[in-house]
Structure formats: C-alpha cells, structure tokens
Regions:
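Nucleotide/phosphate-binding catalytic cleft detector across ATP-hydrolyzing
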Residues: 1-164, 181-183, 203-246
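Glycine-rich phosphate-binding loop of actin/hexokinase-like ATP-binding domains
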Residues: 160-202
Length: 246
C-alpha cells in the first residue's frame, strides 16, 4: 500500500497497519489505543533557520525561548506543508554563541538556531487517516531517522558526531548528530526494494526469489565476500539451475 514512503493504496496500508498493531498487542500483552507514528518519504524536507528576539527584563525565560523559536519559524513554508519538528541546535546571547541552556542568563538579545523538518500536509493526513481507521489515535508524528536514533544511539555518540542511516524498503533515511544536536536530515527515495528489483532483473528471477537471494547472499562490504562462493538459481524459462559465482 506504500511506495517510497508515499501511500498509494489506502485500504492496503490500513490493513497492513492493523496487522502490525495486532502483532504488537499480541507480543506485548497490552492494548494499543494511541501511538507516535514515524514518517518518511520523498515528501519530507528540512531547512535551517534562525530566530532572534529581545530578552524580557534582561533575564532569559522559557517565554523568551518560545518567542525565539516562533520567530525562527517565520520562513517561507508553503501552505501545503506541515511542520513536524522545530529542533533547537543552540543559542546566542548578545553575540556569545554555543549556549545550550540559556534560561536564567542575563542579556539583551537572544538568538536560536533551529533545524525545521516539514512534510506534505496531504501525505501526513493520509497516514493519519490509515492509522486512525484501525482505532488507534495518532499522538504525534516523528521523522523516521530521529525515531531510529532514539533506539540505537548513545548520548556519547551524539556528542562526538554520528550519522544514522536507516535503509527501509522504499527509502533510505539519514540523520546527522553533532554536539548532541540534529544538524542534518534527509530522506532518499531509494531503498532495499530497488536492490531486490535489480537482482530480479539481472538474474531473471521473481521478486520473492530475488528477495531470498538478497537476504541469503547479500553483503554490506565487498571484503566479506569470497571469490569461491557459489549459489544456484533457476531463472524464468530455464529448466535447469544456474550457478552464480560472486
């Protein structure tokens, strides 16, 4: 029901989500009534923006931070886009940058540097419609590589600098962390399904058979392969198996 992160069949997508929810409920023993939903696709984009405001009463408060974040969002975001995240990357007070926690600090001018992630409003609503058709309430949407990072990254890795690369079926999702902040995100509309398709075309196999070959014999690094490794396949129209050396 989805292709490269975009819904192409509402019914199939809803049914797939329902099966996933049922499986999760069965394995966890809990009823799922609401969820944070990860999102990806070629419709997702991001920009960097800055916002600046005067500091009320000369001491930074949460109100000042909120005002600065709102100012950062005064950018040319089209009406057909929905803001998923406004991620603060650092603050500057009166020209002093590199500040992470400005609350309580004295100054006159507060600036914030942000990373703003948006998605197609129509795509977001289509995903919401499919999820809520299963009886599960969508609490919020989160960009897929950010959700993945919460699971696989340590704080030390985020601090030193790291990139998350999540290769899915239809997309490859990237997020770069520097100094514990998100500095770059992107969604590339190419994933594992394209590799399967190339194998099917090159070896003249069905997609299910090509997927089996990819999983069984695929290697992430060329150094992991052996020049003497051989496997057998039966291409379309062939009665006898063919040996493949790689």
């Amino acid at each position: 029901g989805m292709r490269k992160g975009m819904i192409v069949d509402l019914t199939k997508t809803t049914n797939a989500i329902a099966k996933s929810i049922e499986k999760a409920q069965r394995s966890s023993g809990y009823e799922i009534t609401s969820a944070l939903v990860s999102i990806a696709g070629s419709h997702v984009s991001s920009i960097n923006s800055r916002g600046a405001v005067g500091i009320t009463n000369g001491v930074v408060s949460q109100v000042d931070i909120n005002r600065a974040l709102e100012a950062a969002q005064v950018v040319a975001i089209p009406h057909d886009r929905e803001v998923l995240h406004v991620i603060q990357r650092g603050f500057t007070i009166d020209g002093q940058d590199g500040i992470n926690e400005p609350i309580g600090m004295h100054g006159y001018r507060l600036e914030v540097e942000t990373h703003i992630i948006t998605a197609s409003a129509a795509s977001v609503e289509n995903i919401r419609k499919c999820v809520e058709a299963t009886g599960v309430k969508v609490k919020a949407f989160v960009l897929n590589p950010l959700a993945s990072a919460e699971v696989v990254l340590t704080e030390a890795e985020r601090q030193l600098g790291v990139m998350v690369c999540d290769i899915g079926g239809g997309t490859t999702d990237l997020a770069v962390y520097i100094n514990n902040n998100v500095w770059y995100t992107t969604v590339i509309p190419i994933g594992g399904d394209l590799i399967t398709s190339d194998i099917a075309y090159g070896l003249r196999l069905s997609l299910p058979d090509a997927e089996k070959v990819k999983v069984a014999y695929g290697r992430a690094k060329e150094s992991d392969t052996s020049a003497h490794e051989i496997f057998s396949i039966r291409p379309f129209g062939e009665e006898e198996a063919t040996e493949i050396r790689y």
